[in-house]
């Protein structure tokens, strides 16, 4: 028992439990000046926005400090990565401190748009100045987003899982309830529920198999005897991007709708905003096309974020490693990028089929939205659990050895 209490996993897990408690506590801190008895609490915000917010650490249905969640930060990270791909921008050459500061500026801009859209849509109590209520709630929502970013950083440093744990907590707390409400609302019988469970387990099995699949590139190390060469290789996942495209695509695609809702509230006479808000609502044809295109693009982009040929080639050159029949340096970088590109396309197609394909059912009935996202959630869950498992395995590696005089 003493050994367990002193283990690094237990200590880090204790910190993570504390951070999750703080997150749950903040999720129950309701924003001020809101008329909770109003029949249309979300105002211009659709239920689909509330649902997608729950997948990114937010909860619009509770009108709490963390209603916007980590969505602005996630959107800022993917936009920054896209900007950094261009060598002409020079963003990747900036000092880390400046990069982090500009990422926070971008996060603030996106958080301002989303928080203002939410605040303007909420019904205000009678007798409260509307301007004061909107300003206060906007500031609180932005502060809530940055607090979650800070909490995620603390969890990365002291706990287990980083921001992944916050997202998992949000999904576990909100999505089962919303899926249950969908089943009740659609009057789905027991046979269909059992079929959905079986299909869900099948999707989970496929997701786990694909998550563990690897392509191994043989690596040779200078001054290492050849009989050890079988243990030297570079792993490339079958889906190098993992489940990240699904999560980030939802965050990225929701930004235009927040922006349009904000324009509609500020300029109610513009008729075109209603048309585009309706077109970009989750489950509509234009949204589905945009979502699947973003899924595919992010599937390729994140593959090169996770497996960078340039960084690996530079690290191999410094450590005296090389790939058989490939010259070190630029040739190694091009070879690795070529391999990654092949699997990135395979992974992007797999992600579109697994996460985007089932959502085509909402064209028949939009009320199937929550159920159609179950396969995508399995992709996220499998990736999250695998990452946490790898992190725990790395932390317990040193503890698996015994001291010489123990």
From Swiss-Prot:
Segments crossing the lipid bilayer: 14-34, 63-83, 108-128, 131-151, 156-176, 190-210, 246-266, 285-305, 344-364, 368-388
Pfam families, per the entry: SecY (PF00344)
Alphabetical UniProt keywords: Cell membrane, Membrane, Protein transport, Translocation, Transmembrane, Transmembrane helix, Transport
Example GO biological process: intracellular protein transmembrane transport
An annotated GO cellular component: plasma membrane
Membrane topology of this protein: Multi-pass membrane protein
Record's subcellular location: Cell membrane
InterPro entries linked: SecY/SEC61-alpha (IPR002208), SecY2 (IPR014269), SecY_dom_sf (IPR023201)
Main localization (coarse): membrane
Keyword Cytoplasm applies: no
Quaternary state and interactors: Component of the accessory SecA2/SecY2 protein translocase complex required to export cell wall proteins. May form heterotrimers with SecE and SecG subunits.
PANTHER family the UniProt entry points to: SECY/SEC61-ALPHA FAMILY MEMBER
NCBIfam families linked: acc_sec_Y2, PRK12417.1
Function: Part of the accessory SecA2/SecY2 system specifically required for export of possible cell wall proteins. The central subunit of a protein translocation channel.
Family of the protein in this entry: Belongs to the SecY/SEC61-alpha family. SecY2 subfamily.
Protein name: Accessory Sec system protein translocase subunit SecY2
Taxon lineage: Bacteria, Bacillati, Bacillota, Bacilli, Lactobacillales
